[in-house]
Amino acid sequence: MGVQFNDSIPKKNISITDLKNKTVAIDSMNIIYQFLSSIRLRDGAPLRNSKGEITSPYNGIFYKTIYLLNNEITPIWVFDGKPPELKLKTREERRKVKEKASKDYEIAKREENIEDMQKYAKRINYLEPNTVDNCKKLLKLMGIPYIDAPSEGEAQCAHMIKNGDAYCVVSQDYDALLYGAPRTVRNITASNKPLELMEIEDILKPLDISIDDLIDMAILIGTDYNIGGIKGIGPKKALTIIKNKKMNEYIKDIENYEEIKNIFKNPKVVDYTKEDIKLKSPNIEGLKEFLIEENDFSPNRILPSIKKLDKLLNEKRSQTSLDSWF
């Protein structure tokens, strides 16, 4: 969900070539939900294997990773750990939205209204118990690094950017900026939208605010830890409050204000080694078994893609070895 800054945050359109020779830290859960929304059948239903298990995330991860490698971009996928207690309310709100969408979908299905079926199906997104583990299994088989964050994935991504191990966070949300990420790129999963780059300095300097001010703006508007924020306050009004130094007048109306701010300013992150984020050789037979035998992907599509993945990773590792000599 994330904070809804919308058009109040300056962005600039970039090309995929602008990320060439760079490493990106991917907010995995955010992007996986994007795959669940976008990779669907004509009636809005997600892709499933013969056992009835949803496979849209595996499709998205496999082909998007190859797309990034083909554009000379190194991905590191970062998965959420245990969420802060304050986020439980957000999950309950999402559950209610999905329940209503499920009922609306069934009505549209009975009426054979394909357009409404597609609309409501995209709101039902949910992860099956083994989906995340299988996504990690797929990445390991592909030879692609991933990190398990202790808590929020965006915070871990931001930590990796600040460490110099990645150039930007890849996410549809703005939250990574609140954790101090210097750069976030949006729309990497969208085929019909330009990539959007948000740089923290290009946000703070023109607005003449600090990162603390940006966090306060987010809390006024509403975050995953205080859904809805303060009634009647959107991005423009929040900025006015901050610029006029009026934040203290609103703190008393914000439950758990200090705890929320501390989540953003002092997030839980995990240390990692260079080996943890290194590209490795793909397990070709393992990929065939997982994608084709276990999840019913078409061999005609998968086999050439596995071959391409192997070629791209070999080229990448060869280049890395060559660079280490100079």
Curated annotation (Swiss-Prot):
The keyword Transferase does not apply. Pfam families: XPG_I (PF00867), XPG_N (PF00752). Mg(2+) 2 binds at D173, D175, D224. Interacts with PCNA. PCNA stimulates the nuclease activity without altering cleavage specificity. GO terms for molecular function: 5'-3' exonuclease activity; 5'-flap endonuclease activity; DNA binding; magnesium ion binding. Keywords: DNA damage, DNA repair, DNA replication, Endonuclease, Exonuclease, Hydrolase, Magnesium, Metal-binding, Nuclease. Residues 318-326 are annotated as: Interaction with PCNA. Its EC number is 3.1.-.-. Residues 116-245 are annotated as: I-domain. InterPro entries: 5-3_exonuclease_C_sf, Flap_endonuc, Flap_endonuc_arc, HhH2, PIN-like_dom_sf, XPG-I_dom, XPG/Rad2, XPG_DNA_repair_N. Structure-specific nuclease with 5'-flap endonuclease and 5'-3' exonuclease activities involved in DNA replication and repair. During DNA replication, cleaves the 5'-overhanging flap structure that is generated by displacement synthesis when DNA polymerase encounters the 5'-end of a downstream Okazaki fragment. Binds the unpaired 3'-DNA end and kinks the DNA to facilitate 5' cleavage specificity. Cleaves one nucleotide into the double-stranded DNA from the junction in flap DNA, leaving a nick for ligation. Also involved in the base excision repair (BER) pathway. Signal peptide: none annotated. Belongs to the XPG/RAD2 endonuclease family. FEN1 subfamily. It comes from the Archaea. Binds 2 magnesium ions per subunit. They probably participate in the reaction catalyzed by the enzyme. May bind an additional third magnesium ion after substrate binding. NCBIfam families: fen_arch. Mg(2+) 1 binds at D27, D80, E152, E154. Residues 1-98 are annotated as: N-domain. Its cofactor is Mg(2+). Coiled coil: none annotated. This is Flap endonuclease 1. The gene is fen.
